[in-house]
């Protein structure tokens, strides 16, 4: 018979906060002692509709290796991740970056691996200072140096020395072990006096080096006369 009836009603779709989506970062590699920044970005369908903003945060699994901090740039979903690599440290750490919206109830996070590659650090030669001795008197002094790589990389340290006037003073060195100590010996030539420059160098197993130049003053000493045989 084709009889019918109809009714119109309204369906209200309530808004639900959507989680932001963090753009993939990927694993990172850097050399020891080098800090760097990574640009962060994320998207959120609610930003334009609900006037939301995004905030970044980050954490490191090993703060003795790398410290992390973030800065949010405006409301457009961009930011900066700063990786502060600690001095003379190498290895790997897991870094977790999180982005949250202004409602604070939804977030997205990503974890990546930061690998810090070891770099040879040059040794440091302990200051020696100028020296004074008398004519005809040989002597020795202890010389020392340090190297942050000695314990971690099993490095050894070797000393060498050069005199700019071997007619006045000749020099030689004896290197110790990996503790970075040695002996510098001065062979003062007979009946000679004056001032000579001595250059001392410390070298590690990977070729890193440090040098210092100092002066040795040889003071004259009165020599007794020699009577010719009669």
Feature roles, as predicted:
Residues 1-3, 100-106, 202-208:
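Short, solvent-exposed loop/turn segments at the edges of extracellular beta-sandwich modules
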Residues 3-5, 9, 18-64, 86, ...:
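Extracellular ectodomain surface segments
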Residues 34-40, 77-79, 90-96, 137-143, ...:
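Short, solvent-exposed loop/turn segments enriched in Ser/Thr/Gly
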Residues 60, 74, 101, 163, ...:
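Acidic surface patches and DE-rich sequence motifs
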Residues 63-86, 95-96, 167-189, 198-199:
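Strand-loop-strand motifs at the edges of beta-sheets in extracellular beta-sandwich domains
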